[in-house]
Amino acid sequence: MAESSNKPFRGPVRANDRKANRRGAARLAAVQALYQMDIAGAGINDVLAEFESHWLGSEVEGEQYLPAEAAFFRDIVSGVVRDQTKIDPVLDTALERGWPLQRIEAILRAVLRAGAYELERRKDVPAKVVVSEYVDIAHAFVERDETGMVNAVLEQLARQYRADEMGPK
């Protein structure tokens, strides 16, 4: 894994950035929760309760994290769990041949699943914002080549789910 910080959503916030940063913090927390569920086999109710009571907006290792938009966090995690049997085959198709979803790192699976869910279901968020946010999250955990793969897969899904919004290549 990359040596970069896994703490991208901290520090001073301007008032007009607050909503975006609360959503960014919710996305990061959702990816971490999905990762925990994948690796540890934790159940959704336990993970949601743990993150909502101990992580969202808390001080962790001496760093104060922005409060996350809890409803947005819950929607992403619950939506991915609910729709995973639909999301995973779409991701398998979008990934390069020979690299099925189960073969890539668990953190990348979590990033791609959350991004795919948001692109398909959260039409209130512009597709370019979704792609950019999840690429930024991937940067916190993996090397540059892998973030390029995240960008390529999510761009492909954005064109599939939101062709009218994305326009021509």
From Swiss-Prot:
Keyword Signal (UniProt): no
Keyword RNA-binding: yes
Record-level GO BP terms: DNA-templated transcription termination; transcription antitermination
Coiled coil location: none
Family assignment from sequence similarity: Belongs to the NusB family.
Start and end residues of each stretch annotated as Disordered: 1-20
Protein name per its UniProtKB record: Transcription antitermination protein NusB
